[in-house]
C-alpha cells in the first residue's frame, strides 16, 4: 500500500497543479484529486496537500513537493 496524497481541485487551480503533476508521476505514491477537502481557510492562503491525512504546506509547488517527501521520510508508512 502506497502513501496517499490528496489535493483539493481549488488548490490545484491556485498553483498546486505543478506539485500534483510531479507527485502523480511517482509510482510509489497514490495521488488523488478531490472537489473539496473542507480546508477552505487553508486552501485560500497557501498550497497544501493531505499526506496520509496530515496537512503538509508549501509556499510554492516545488516547496510543497519537497515538504511532502520530507514528511514521508520522517513518517515512514
Swiss-Prot record:
Pfam families for the chain: DUF1450 (PF07293)
InterPro entries: DUF1450 (IPR009910), UPF0349 (IPR022916)
Taxonomic superkingdom: Bacteria
Protein family membership: Belongs to the UPF0349 family.
Protein name (database record): UPF0349 protein lwe2340
Organism expressing this protein natively: Listeria welshimeri serovar 6b (strain ATCC 35897 / DSM 20650 / CCUG 15529 / CIP 8149 / NCTC 11857 / SLCC 5334 / V8)
Source organism phylogeny: Bacteria, Bacillati, Bacillota, Bacilli, Bacillales
Amino acid at each position: 500500500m502506497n502513501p496517499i496524497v490528496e489535493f483539493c481541485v481549488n488548490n490545484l487551480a491556485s498553483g498546486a497543479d505543478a506539485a500534483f503533476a510531479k507527485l502523480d508521476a511517482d509510482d510509489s505514491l497514490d495521488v488523488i484529486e478531490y472537489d473539496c477537502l473542507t480546508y477552505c481557510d487553508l486552501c485560500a492562503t497557501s498550497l497544501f496537500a493531505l499526506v496520509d491525512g496530515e496537512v503538509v504546506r508549501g509556499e510554492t509547488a516545488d516547496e510543497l513537493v519537497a515538504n511532502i517527501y520530507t514528511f514521508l521520510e520522517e513518517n515512514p508508512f
